[in-house]
Amino acid sequence: MDVETVQAGPALAAHLQLQASPKPQVKKYYFKKKTSSSHSRNGKDDVNHDSTIQPRSPLSRQSLTFDAIPTYHAGAFYEIDHDKLPPKSPIHLKSIRVVKVSECTNLDITVKFPSLQALRSFFSSYPAPGTGPELDERFVMSSNHAARILRRRVTEEELEGEVQQDSFWLIKPRLYDFAAPQQVPSRTLCLPPPPAPPAATLGLTADSCLLTTLKCDGAGWGMRRRVRYIGRHRDEAPKEASVDGYDTESSVREVQQPPATQEVKRSERNCKRKREAEASSKDNNGDEGKKNNKVQGASKKISKKAKKRTVESKDGDPRHGKDRWSAERYAAAEKSLLNIMRSRDARFGAPVMRQVLREEARKHIGDTGLLDHLLKHMAGRVPEGSVHRFRRRHNADGAMEYWLEPAELAEVRKQAGVSDPYWVPPPGWKPGDDVSLVAGDILVKRQVEELTEEVNGVKRQMEQLLCKDDGDFGAERDYSSLKEKYQRAVRANEKLEKQVLCLKDMCENVVQMNGELKKEVSAFKEKYEHIADKNDKLEEQVTYLSSSFLSFKDQLVVALKLELAPSEAVPRTALFVASGEQMTGTVIQGGQDRAERKSSFRVCKPQGKFLLPSMASGMTIGRGASSTCPAAATPGPGIPRSTSFPSMPGLPRSSRGPVEVVAAASGLDEHVMFGAHFSTPPSASSTNDAAKLQLSLPSPRSPLQPQKLFDTVTAAASGFSPQKLMHFSGLTRRDVDTSSSSSGACGSGLLEGKRVLFDADAGGISAVGTELALATPSYC
């Protein structure tokens, strides 16, 4: 193999370099090449073929003997001999078995052949019968080379029967399983190759290496060079093992140098020579002596610096170095960088740039030398106690970017057989799955083709349906009308839905208002019931009061009739009104002029009670006495009495009768006592002093109206007229002038109490005044 072949394929050169090593697994494809059968096909003997055809330049243009050149037909397929291919032939041609002659001239012959991409596309699809792959590659060769390379013509029968088989186009089809491409198992690499002829070893090596390279998924086409850095204090740096099966920047390190005794001796000898030279030339040139001194000092500094720069390291790890930084500082700085990259979520596909990482790390790492050293040499390292590995590389713009990856990813790459140091398993990938790009491309292509066929079938069916619909115009019109009706129904349905929503909202509002109204009605009902209860109680009280007044009226009329005759002989009438424990007496004088008579009767709390005449029999009325109530006039304990009353002017003596009214108050009750002919109304019992006369006022809205005390006929028969009883029937309130009455303890109580004026001579009551009966009741 010459230099041109190595330049044509970088991967081929790398493979040849690996073949020089004693590993036998590189020769795994050598035994597949059979040169004897190829020579027998051509019908020529191997020895005669080599003796008659001398090696020439691939593009030689010397004169040719036309009788020795075979005739080639344009459009015919020929089988090629790979051993005779020139070095500058296309690299893809080394894996092709047959080619097609497209053009023939006296000097050149042009052949066409399919590329590997065209073969993949052809075999991954479903080719039609009688078709072949696309011949997208072309190669022009001389007539002499064509005579050596094109060994035989492919027959028509063979072409028709095997054109759709991969063995027809490829020399080793098992390496190109286009249906399910997989790599050759690694265990086959350990099989020793069978012995091959010495003459064909080089060609087979190139052929096998080429096929192996073509079979790769694309990760091995690049060229990587190992850079070895040798410092000024090192003559040669030993080769170190790469990290995770690939070279990184951290693979090149300064290692510990053995004791540099020879360098020290050499420097000492140089120093001695310089000192001797300085001593010999000291007298001749002083400047040269100074210069030599400077050189000597510089050499000493260099030797000391070389001693200091010896680094003690293990496995190329700078964390164990003791030159400038301790292992603790290394660990702390690496931890800071790891935390920063974790906080920024630096991962593959979303790295962090060097400038950003350095600016952030400067806040935690003060030594810029240590920081720059770590940024340069931390790639491929796994910090202590972490499960992530530092990675870095240059992006397309040339900027350095850093990220973190799982520490076990390197072992996964090694087990998967991927040589790309930046390969990341795709989502859903499992150990044992194919990692080649070709497998994924073929699978995607098949799926796309299947989907395309399904879509085409659907399109055909739609076209057929459209054709049928075009013939039936009535159905189309019906369909359009039904579609319009459906759209109208949809619009009407939408309107109805809106109306239903509005009605629903209104119903909810009405229900809410109904609930509020129910609450208000219940509240009003409770108030009404309360008012009705009050009204019932008031009506009962008014009814009771009316019955009391009626009974009082009847008794009063009867009493007045009975006392009408005796009252004429009585000169005056005495009235005792008791309020509390005091009693005030007033003497009412009767006269002919009744208009001059003034009297009033006021009933205050507590309520009054009438006494029978027998209870007032012990009372005596003294004539001409003062208005005070003496103790001798008291009928019983607690009731003051007055024996004499001052005569009132304007009243005749004949009208003053022995009528006595006593009002006694005990606790909350007030008892009013009239003459002997006055009886107690049925509502007020005379035997029980604690009985009360409820003087409840009628309601303003009560249907009960005040009634007349006397009937007209009865009043006329008795000598009373309605005009005389007008004040009594209406119960008109009148104020009494108390200035003319005498003052005293009993008199003040009489004036403050209730007053009643009786006219015995006239046989009636001139006026009756009371606050309870006269005041118009009102309720809140």
From Swiss-Prot:
Task performed by this protein: Plays a fundamental role in building the proper chromosome structure at the beginning of meiosis in male meiocytes. Required for the transition from leptotene to zygotene in meiocytes. Required for homologous chromosome pairing, and initiation and progression of meiotic recombination. Regulates meiocyte cytoskeleton organization.
Compositionally biased spans, kind Basic and acidic residues: 263-291, 309-327
Matching InterPro entries: DYAD/AMEIOTIC1
Subcellular location field: Nucleus; Chromosome
Gene symbol of the encoding locus: AM1
Protein name: Protein AMEIOTIC 1
Compositionally skewed regions (Polar residues) per UniProt: 50-60
Ranges in coiled-coil conformation: 448-547
Primary location recorded for the protein, binned into one broad class: nucleus
PANTHER family: PROTEIN DYAD
Region (Disordered): 32-60, 237-327
A biological process from GO: cell division
Record's keyword terms, sorted: Cell cycle, Cell division, Chromosome, Chromosome partition, Coiled coil, Meiosis, Nucleus
Observed effect of gene inactivation: Sterile phenotype due to male meiosis arrested at leptotene.
GO CC annotations on file: chromosome; nucleus
